[in-house]
Amino acid sequence: YKRQAFMWPCYEMFTNNTIRTSLNGWGQNGPYKGDMDAGYFEQKYESGYNDFAYQTVASVASGNGWNFSSFIRRINIMLSHIDDSEMTEAQKNHWRAVGYFFHSFWYMELIDRFGAVPWVDQVLQEDSPEAYGPRIDRKTVADNVLERLKWAEENIGDFTSEDGKNTINKDCILAAISRFGLREGTWRKYHELGDYDKYLQESVRASELLMSAYPTLYTGTDGQPAAGYGEMWTTEDLSTVPGIILYKEYVTDINPMGTSYIEHTSSHYVEMNQKTVDLYLMKNGKPILNAESEYHGDKDMYATFRDRDPRMYHTIMPPYKVKAGGGTYRTWSYTDNEADREYIDIMGANTSCSNPGIGMKRLPGQNWSASLVPEIPRLGTGAFVTCRSGYYVWKNWDNWETNFNNGNLNTADKPIFKIEEVLLNEAEAKFELGNFDQGVADKTINKLRERAGVARMVVAEIDANFDPNRGKYYPKNNDAGVEVDPVLWEIRRERIIELMGEGFGFYDIRRWRMAPWFLNRPATGIWMSKADALSNNMTLYNPETGYSDGTSGTMAEGYLYLFND
């Protein structure tokens, strides 16, 4: 068991904060960070602008994941002693495969962040010349990573009886190939580096093996539309949940965390902007600007949410209003306005605030001490469960956990690799290889939509007019940008929505070469009258100037302006 104990620290890669899909931390410092960097989310400060959009990211002399003396050194030490061990040949191959997986997983991040990096595959001493060697070109390093992952796939054994459940196995390696093949293949394609097909083909191959092994999606237990989607991040035990390949287990008194707790407090700083809200389809499968969308408009928050993709309800707290009861401020009753209960009826009623409470995501909400949140939107920055855009992000929120007086009482497991990402990898890689059709859509995107309660994608219906607000990518020396292919845009939309809040955004917009489109748009909130905006110490966005209309502007209503000029 020495080899196991020596390798356990490598599992900390999945909670390493230099990796944007890291499960460590919460709020803007946890998995949301990658999607905040991508412009999908905002911080609820007046000065909470995107560092990449405003070019305020400071360079650092060290760190940011440029590290070969921690994980890489540990892995190389283990690998260097395998041949001298008394293990069987099968055991040696197994542990070499585990080492190759972790070595490759760390290098996947190094390549994404730095491009060309040193290739360190042996134990280095202080006087080793390799310790001060040059960077190796991106292609060579990426080829090495893919080669090692494929070797690991072919040689890892089934040692669950020795390693334990929920440890690195063949399926984890296939999930890494699926992710890396798509990431590197599309980066190479859109950055005109060539030799991208083999990465995309490997992504497809690995994805299809996993799709055969994990044919079922989790549908949840709490009964709301898209419950399986929402409960993937709020479930106590993921060990028996369909589609889970690897997960982070949290246990009371051992390693509890506070991702749900923080979203019940005033310290949760993550909100969604209007542009990202606009990406969510209608339940009929149409973009909101499609001529057949039946969109209800965004001049009223109830209308904005009506008949939308239910995954939106599990990511942003839906609007409502109730009358608070007396005494402990935990009971409530419905208002006389029928519209105020529309989304309470959809999500299920939190009949009386308690700690722990009822179910997963229920309305009305409650804070960390089980005090009632009487209405959403709830604008501001100081009180609990507030935000400035009106779109409060609550992906990790649940009622069933204890969220009282301490940030580290939550024990809901969190996924690391799951089949939903694999389905999206398959769809996108197939398109980039010229092989996406209705059959592929039905095996991938339409499985996700069926669970969410959204109409299926019909490839033949998607033309240049399907979404008048299609995004642009920016080839080299083309500042004007080029509209993304209509079908590819819908594939990417599905990825953005399904993986929202999981940290993939910054990886994706860069490999797609779409960062300017996502980052350079004005960050706005819900539609509001000027009087209501000013009463909340906010102003309106003026589309003619691209800035705030100010306190003395002429606009009577408009979208909330989120940041200082």
Q: Which role does the model predict for each range below?
A:
Residues K2-Y40, L149-E153, D171-L174, R179-S369, ...:
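An aromatic- and glycine-enriched ligand-binding surface/loop that stacks and positions planar moieties
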Residues I111-P118, F180-E192, E432-N435:
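Short coil/turn linking the two alpha-helices of tandem helical-hairpin repeats
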Residues Q4-W8, E12-R20, A38-F114, E130-K165, ...:
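Conserved, well-structured interaction surfaces
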Residues R96, H103, I177, E184, ...:
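Structural register within alpha-helical repeat arrays
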Residues F68-S69, N144-L146, P225-A291, N406-I416, ...:
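Long, intrinsically disordered, low-complexity segments
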Residues P310-L448:
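C-terminal substrate/ligand-recognition segments
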Residues A116-R138, W187-Q201:
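Short coil/linker segments at helix-helix boundaries
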